[in-house]
Amino acid sequence: MASEKKETKSSSMLEAAHELFTSKGVNETSIDDIVKKAKVAKGTFYLYFKDKYDLVDRIASKKSTAVILAALNELDRACQQNPMPFTDRIIFFVDYIIEYLQDNKQLFRILYKNLSKGLFATEEAKAAASRFCDGYVAEGGDPATAKQMLFLLVEMVGATCYSAIAEERPYTMDEIRPALYTALKQIVS
């Protein structure tokens, strides 16, 4: 019962903070705003989180994990139906992330450019990442650097998406997407 109550309070604060961060922005949201929306005492906040930025990191990790997992799982489904070369898998994976972030621009208020936070954050994410890396190795990639390569790809995509989707500068996503795909293909070949 006590554990369940603690989980409810934590979830309530995470949900309240997520809503506030995506609507107002992190800098414009105070801890007072969060506890008021979550209907908990301010002291309760500090039992669960060091400060507002600890909360931001946890939400960013959770959200980036969800995006990456969704992309990798969708890629797995697509490959079961229609096997594809690794470079095509990369484009599929990146396309999914781009489309998701274009549909959920407000996530950039939390994620900023840090999409890779969730890459190896959970066992499920690690397993999905390993499946992706197996494809890289199967096509001649170095097993010792497969996870590093995935990290670099996600970092590059996250930073590019932030600039092109959230800021629309120096290029929009439509303008930069072909160059991004060319660069990604060159990196893994």
Regions found by a protein language model. Name each.
Residues M1-K24, E28-V40, D54:
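Basic, helix-initiating cap at the start of DNA-binding domains
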Residues S10-E19, T65, L69-L72, I91:
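A short, Lys/Arg-enriched amphipathic alpha-helix from helix-turn-helix/homeodomain DNA-binding modules
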Residues K39-F49:
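Short hydrophobic/aromatic patch on the recognition helix
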Residues V56-A70, L111, E124:
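Alpha-helical DNA-contacting segments of helix-turn-helix folds
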Residues R58, N73-Q102:
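Hydrophobic alpha-helical connector segments
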Residues L69, E99-D103, S116-F151:
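Amphipathic alpha-helical packing segments from all-alpha helical-bundle domains
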Residues F92-F120, A159-A166:
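Amphipathic alpha-helical segments used for helix-helix packing
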Residues F108-K113, A138-A183:
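Hydrophobic/aromatic-rich alpha-helical bundle segments in the mid-to-C-terminal region
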